[in-house]
């Protein structure tokens, strides 16, 4: 009842039956469910894609094996948003030059079964603003920014660049948007910041 339209969670940390129950509760509340892939190898990533089908989520965010994942998701209605660029390590880091990442974004966006992109912009060690503008300007699919979203300034920068959305996780649990506030108040602070920059 705070105005969230999308709620996401990672594919690790809870047993499958608890993830399934969580997805069902989110849907019952009228929100769409986003599953974030947290995998360090191809096998785990493909397992996460299969889990997205079994969980009944609406979006699958992340992953670097788009050809295989689009085959798994074909006909499911799940909107898949892979990572453009070269993603390494855990927590994930985005590597490569802006042109290389932008070309990866173009290639992915043109693939059948890809509905958007999940850009690890703040996990990039170069010019983040230039990267985001380059990727958003190069594709005709929604661009979601994930990772290290921890300030109103970053929300404003992404809005100015024209991203479709962003994910926030740890910053809410760490109280980065409203010091000493409840989880609900943290979410409300992020939504308020988003509305302010969108108007």
Question: Can you say where each PLM-predicted feature lies in the sequence?
Answer:
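Hydrophobic faces of well-ordered beta-strands that scaffold small-molecule active sites
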Residues: 5-9, 33-37, 60-62, 80-83, ...
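Glycine-rich phosphate-binding active-site loops on the catalytic face of alpha/beta enzymes
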Residues: 54-68, 112-124, 148-150, 154, ...
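Charged helix-capping and loop-helix junction motifs
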Residues: 20, 95-103, 127-133, 180-187
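Catalytic cores of alpha/beta
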Residues: 42-54, 96-103, 130-145, 149-168
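Conserved anion-binding
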Residues: 38, 42-124, 189
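Helix C-cap/helix->beta junction micro-motif
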Residues: 29-30, 76, 139
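Conserved N-terminal beta1-alpha1 strand-loop-helix module at the mouth
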Residues: 1-33, 39-43, 51-56, 106-113, ...
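Short, acidic/turn-prone active-site loops that include or flank metal/cofactor-
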Residues: 12-13, 38-40, 84-88, 148-149, ...
